[in-house]
Amino acid sequence: MPNYEKVEFQTLDGLTLRGRLFRAEGAGGNRTAAVVITPPYVIVQDVMVSDIAVYFSQQGITALTYDTRSFGESDGQPRCELDLSKQVDDYSDAFTFLASLPSVDPSKIGFWGISFCATVALNAAALDRRSRFVISVGPIVKASDENPYPIDKVHRVLTKALRDRESQLRGNTPFYVESTCEDGSNPTGFGPELGIEAYELVQRIAASGIAPNFSTQLTLQSFAKILRWHPMQDIKWLGETPMMLMIPGDDTVSLPEEQMRLFDMITGPKRVEVAAGKSHFNVLASEGFEGLMDMQVEFIKQTLGLSS
């Protein structure tokens, strides 16, 4: 079992987010660099990100993971409502929590994300000038101005979302949809289609029982909130914050060429690595994991001027 401490911290709007602190090994009482890590989409911290956090901690970097608001162990109502704009703010509150720890050097904290949260992490780093670095693995970039959503599908979802809003105001429960359809399509008909691999992943997690707070569903309002989120406008403000982009070479959810356009848009210090033969969801799974993680550790240590 990974060695971690259960922790919690407050957000500015009064929620309690619950996570796990993986302290840097071999620190010898010295303050260490640290990284904020969140699981993407409907995934919870029991899955996927613990291995990342353990690896960083073994390399002398403290790691904080937490369930995003309204998912897993964290507070937030309605449950399973994806609010990416609020998640951006939560990265900053997680930073503040880490910076308050006597074992962490507040001048050496950065952000990490994968898939949807890879874009959220970039957005957060662009807006929070305290972040010393950001690592983005397979960011979803289809929400950019270069890839507008079909207007007819947008209007259809907005109409349904407004009806659901009216219903909730009458005291009814929120309307929920599956996060991914069985054929891999987006349940609302617009936005990124995560593919059959995503459907199989969430079904596998649900069946395994390893994450008792996990749900395969999202509120319908989640998709209206995605529509109102425009991260590419903010990411342009990343400035001189060093960024590492890791692109899954066989990504069919967020195409490698789209991710490269994002990389080219960044004007500050940056590094790109392509994980050959890796898909969107298995980029940091099993074979090749250590090599890809070593690249990220090297990037952090070089950026912060730390010895290897």
Swiss-Prot record:
Enzyme Commission numbers on file: 2.3.-.-
S-S pairs: none
One GO process term, biological-process aspect: antibiotic biosynthetic process
Domain of life: Eukaryota
Pathway the protein takes part in: Secondary metabolite biosynthesis
MF terms (GO), sorted A to Z: transferase activity
Similarity remark: Belongs to the polyketide transferase af380 family.
Full protein name: Polyketide transferase claH
Organism: Penicillium crustosum
